A protein has these predicted regions:
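Short, glycine/charged-enriched secondary-structure capping and boundary segments
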Residues: 6-9, 51-54, 74-77, 93-94, ...
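Active-site regions of enzymes building and remodeling cell-envelope glycoconjugates
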Residues: 10-15, 33-37, 56-60, 75-81, ...
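Short, acidic/turn-prone active-site loops that include or flank metal/cofactor-
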Residues: 18-23, 65-67, 82-86, 221-226
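Short, charged, surface-exposed secondary-structure boundary motifs
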Residues: 23-28, 48, 69-75, 87-94, ...
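PLP-dependent aminotransferase-like
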Residues: 1-68
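PLP-dependent aminotransferase class I/II
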Residues: 18-19, 38, 101-270
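Active-site PLP attachment segment
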Residues: 75-118
Length: 270
């Protein structure tokens, strides 16, 4: 819905396409010069598909909101989100060849920092309602430049160590859980830096049990469930894929505890 919002606001016509079990597009329509093809670099794991599509679709737009560390391709319009990867109240990046002569105002994040502070001093659970309210406030916003606060935070981060930690944590989960996962996205032979570890399972109730175990697992694409047939692959993925955390806040000990919890639950659930 975040993508659809500006399209509806600007009265831009759009249509959906299907994806397969590799999260690649199922699409063979010719793209006209007045049209564009938008593809999401899912979880930061689909850079090879992005590169492939860039060779065939001159009007490709890449959604790298889930792939902060993926390099943009020359001549391909690409956008990124800092909020999905780091503890900032706002912030995004746009790579484009278009010339923008508009001086956008700087965003004031004062109303959207409470949940970030609460997560540090207390817990994510205790401030989830604040997070939801912050998300609502971000909807239907006019375009702004990144806030000074987010800019300062992002300028102070050790990105090399963040990349290493995310990849290390992903490898831990991949090694332990691949046998139980309908997805198999290895990062051993590429430079992908994942957002999460996508655990696609048929075990009913695993998400709810993890939440009870105080493991925060956001559900992606809840809007998809209400829009497509339950027999579609996309419906199954949206319903049954669990986004396991791998980010830079978690050390090896924490990841091993997570693996143990999932393994135990996986053995007891039908």
């Amino acid at each position: 819905d975040v993508i659809i919002e500006p399209l509806m606001k600007l009265n831009v016509k759009y249509e959906y396409y299907h994806i397969n079990s590799l999260l690649d597009p199922v699409f063979d329509k010719k793209i006209e010069s007045s049209e564009a093809f938008l593809y999401t670099n899912y979880f930061g794991l689909k850079q090879d598909t992005v590169l492939y599509l860039s060779r065939f679709y001159p009007n490709l737009i890449v959604d790298n909101a889930q792939a902060f560390f993926a390099k943009p391709i020359e001549g391909v319009d690409t956008f990124y989100s800092a909020r999905k990867f780091f503890g900032v109240p706002d912030g995004a990046y746009l790579y484009t060849t278009a010339l923008l002569d508009i001086d956008f105002p700087i965003y004031n994040p004062i109303d959207n920092i409470n949940y970030l502070i609460g997560r540090i001093t207390d817990s994510a659970e205790g401030y989830y309602k604040d997070f939801q309210e912050s998300e609502k406030r971000m909807s239907n916003q006019e375009i702004h430049r990144m806030s000074v606060l987010s800019d300062k935070i992002l300028s102070s981060l050790d990105y090399v160590s963040i990349i290493e930690r995310r990849r290390f944590n992903y490898h831990l989960l991949y090694s332990a859980l691949t046998a139980f996962n309908k997805f198999d996205f290895s990062i051993s032979e590429n430079q992908n830096v994942p957002l999460i570890y996508p655990f696609y399972t048929s075990k009913a109730g695993l998400r709810q049990q993890l939440i009870l175990e105080h493991v925060y697992v956001p559900q992606y694409w809840q809007n998809v469930v209400n829009k497509i047939d339950a027999k579609c692959l996309e419906y199954s993925i949206a319903n049954n894929m669990i986004a396991l955390p791998i980010d830079q806040r978690y050390d090896e000990k924490t990841m091993n505890i997570l693996i143990e919890k999932i393994s135990n639950l996986n053995n007891h659930l039908s």
